[in-house]
Amino acid sequence: MNHAPHLYFAWQQLVEKSQLMLRLATEEQWDELIASEMAYVNAVQEIAHLTEEVAPSTTMQEQLRPMLRLILDNESKVKQLLQIRMDELAKLVGQSSVQKSVLSAYGDQGGFVLAPQDNFS
């Protein structure tokens, strides 16, 4: 059985999933990106299974090489965008912790605003 057409199609599908993930990351659609990750992983596993059964010919490898480069480039860009997002979230968590500390330190004042007394009388 010739797996070459099926393998090539599987790689094309992986490229499409990779491009979708890059678009979602670029558009900061983080929930959708996470949701699409499982389909990407499944596509990678399918390719691994297909290449385990029958190793692709040298000609097929040459045809697949540009797709692999594109997928790796997309993955690198997605990782960069995710790192930027993680840095943003870390900053927000840090700010939230500071606010919580301030509220904890000054929030037990019984609802009163403390002001210096005027002792000039």
UniProtKB/Swiss-Prot annotation:
Subunit-structure text: Homodimer. Interacts with FliD and FlhC.
Residue segments, region Required for homodimerization: 1-50
Coiled-coil ranges from the UniProt annotation: none
Protein name: Flagellar protein FliT
GO cellular component: cytosol
Example GO BP: protein folding
Gene that this sequence comes from: fliT
Compartment(s): Cytoplasm, Cytosol
Entry-linked InterPro entries: FliT
Keywords associated with the record: Bacterial flagellum biogenesis, Chaperone, Cytoplasm, Repressor, Transcription, Transcription regulation
Originating species: Escherichia coli O8 (strain IAI1)
Region of interest called FliD binding, as start-end residue ranges on this chain: 60-98
Protein family according to the UniProt entry: Belongs to the FliT family.
Keyword Transcription: yes
Purpose: Dual-function protein that regulates the transcription of class 2 flagellar operons and that also acts as an export chaperone for the filament-capping protein FliD. As a transcriptional regulator, acts as an anti-FlhDC factor; it directly binds FlhC, thus inhibiting the binding of the FlhC/FlhD complex to class 2 promoters, resulting in decreased expression of class 2 flagellar operons. As a chaperone, effects FliD transition to the membrane by preventing its premature polymerization, and by directing it to the export apparatus.
